Swiss-Prot record:
It comes from Bradyrhizobium diazoefficiens (strain JCM 10833 / BCRC 13528 / IAM 13628 / NBRC 14792 / USDA 110). This is Co-chaperonin GroES 2. It comes from the Bacteria. Together with the chaperonin GroEL, plays an essential role in assisting protein folding. The GroEL-GroES system forms a nano-cage that allows encapsulation of the non-native substrate proteins and provides a physical environment optimized to promote and accelerate protein folding. GroES binds to the apical surface of the GroEL ring, thereby capping the opening of the GroEL channel. Belongs to the GroES chaperonin family.
Length: 104
């Protein structure tokens, strides 16, 4: 099924958190928090200002974004767990996700 969000909505797929810390400690599922990072799957056309002019969305499909712990509404589409949120719930876009930082 193809899903097209409306207005300033964004569909995000959560990216799983790391299974262990930088020091090598394995994090059990019982204490793991939901990841607040995800990949943008679909975006709406944008919101409208007071005059009715379309304001385009800043994020694009494929962007890796950070969002608040309680942001969005969880939905299941084609067996995939996804989040639908407003663009304003997104805190920022991760610029370079290919390089990993080393622990200090």
């Amino acid at each position: 099924m193809k899903f097209r969000p409306l207005h300033d909505r964004v569909v995000v797929k959560r990216i799983d958190a790391e299974e262990k810390t930088a020091g090598g400690i394995i994090i059990p599922d019982t204490v793991k928090e939901k990841p607040s990072q995800g990949e943008v799957i679909a975006v709406g056309p944008g919101g409208r200002d007071e005059s009715g002019k379309l304001i385009p969305i800043d994020v694009r499909v494929g962007d890796r974004v950070l969002f608040g712990k309680w942001s969005g509404t969880e939905v299941k589409i084609d067996t995939q767990e996804l989040l639908i949120m407003k663009e304003s719930d997104i805190m920022g876009v991760l610029a370079d996700v290919s390089s990993k930082k080393k622990a200090a």
